[in-house]
């Protein structure tokens, strides 16, 4: 038994901090005593020399009297439950769950609710099963992907059908909690049979239903919510967040690597002024959604807490990654008897400096849980289906990347023709559409003020290439096989030779990232598991840092994470102008690059 005495215990349900002690027996919390050690004679409380006290405790909790009791005086350090990341795509960190957990546990994250639609878009149901079972200590729960592919306007590797979803729900796996983010909100509003069948399947098995409704408002939002959607993580304005909360949605405030919306916590003051705080605060959570391996390794949710306390109290910040998501997902994340002893010991609640992490009753630094050779062996044995034949297109030439109307060819073009340009907006996933006169577009393309962007279908060798123009790079060419949600190959650049080199090198690597300039490969990151992940976290962390550092001056957009931001340019369910292997997509419709 371990007794943590003189602890400031964070009560996440009531928002309190009370001095006391916590007893840990095996992997569970045995007792919690609220004793103010600052105003109590400590000599008789859990004194190592007080054998009577030890025996009494052992008898009470049915432990053998000869078993040792380890008493640790925390001297007022703060103890709170470990954290939940309530909505995350682990694949965005480009490492497997067994690698992800090494960093997550270090920063006190013991539970994650994943929506593995990234790997599902590549290899289908097998990818979901892999993501659920790969981690060893991290508690991985799953929302089954609802929109694979995200829309019918792109080509993915394998669909997830209503039948697939029912088979997963029927397994009665306690870690399968519901239906993942319903991105096809237009289909929901228009009662598209395919997505409605999936929603009804979740209702049939009493599962939760996560939402995805960027900029959806008023009647459309009401219709969306009325179909049974329960949460949303796509808010970007305070009005949007308040409207969704008032309609009963759980609000997931996202603070990821590409999209940063923690400023939405300003609404908590509004709730307090309106007198609705007590009713609605419990429905607010902090989530990552998509996080890079760099941000994962360098702080994860601890960094999110540090940002959150600019808007809320430390306890409120902690509640949004413990009790609030726990209540939504039906989990138990309090410090109370019979719960698992998953605890974080903090030196303070200002900088959130972690002293220790306890997982299932054991201090993290004492757990001999990672045998590197076994991890590599297990990944290899279990995941050959994720590794081989990931990039399935023929080698490309410069001619494959000529654009009708820009490089000649196609229908006759008048000097009054307009060209659509994709314009990313800072750290937002939303893009603008710019219309340029065709001659102006050609001039800007020649001067590297705008770039070519292509999406190559890579799963079924259909030879489809979506073609467009974008305001993104000052120089160089970048390409990636990680591009939401179907993870076709996306490439941006101006030099046709470099573009061909980049996509052909990705094929040879089996997937990943590559940067090319003046005919030379500047840097690369190999992601040979479905073209989106790898099994060596330290390698991927180093190589992603290397490629980001070598390309950081290439971006037109200040402080832009080039590869992560690029990965969302093909996510056509996010407004306004995106690109898939079908071409340019606007408002869920294919639009022409050149308007005659």
Curated annotation (Swiss-Prot):
Keyword GTP-binding: no
Enzyme class (EC, first level): hydrolase
Organism: Methanococcus aeolicus (strain ATCC BAA-1280 / DSM 17508 / OCM 812 / Nankai-3)
InterPro entries the record matches: Adenine_deam, Adenine_deam_C, Amidohydro-rel, Metal-dep_hydrolase_composite, Metal_Hydrolase
Protein name: Adenine deaminase
Key words, A-Z: Hydrolase, Manganese
Substrates-to-products reaction catalysed: adenine + H2O + H(+) = hypoxanthine + NH4(+)
Enzyme nomenclature, EC number: 3.5.4.2
GO-annotated biological processes: adenine catabolic process
Requisite cofactors: Mn(2+)
Listed HAMAP family: Adenine_deamin
GO molecular function: adenine deaminase activity
Signal peptide residue numbers: none
Gene name tied to this protein: ade
SUPFAM superfamilies named in the record: Composite domain of metallo-dependent hydrolases (SSF51338), Metallo-dependent hydrolases (SSF51556)
Family listed: Belongs to the metallo-dependent hydrolases superfamily. Adenine deaminase family.
Pfam families associated with the record: Adenine_deam_C, Amidohydro_1
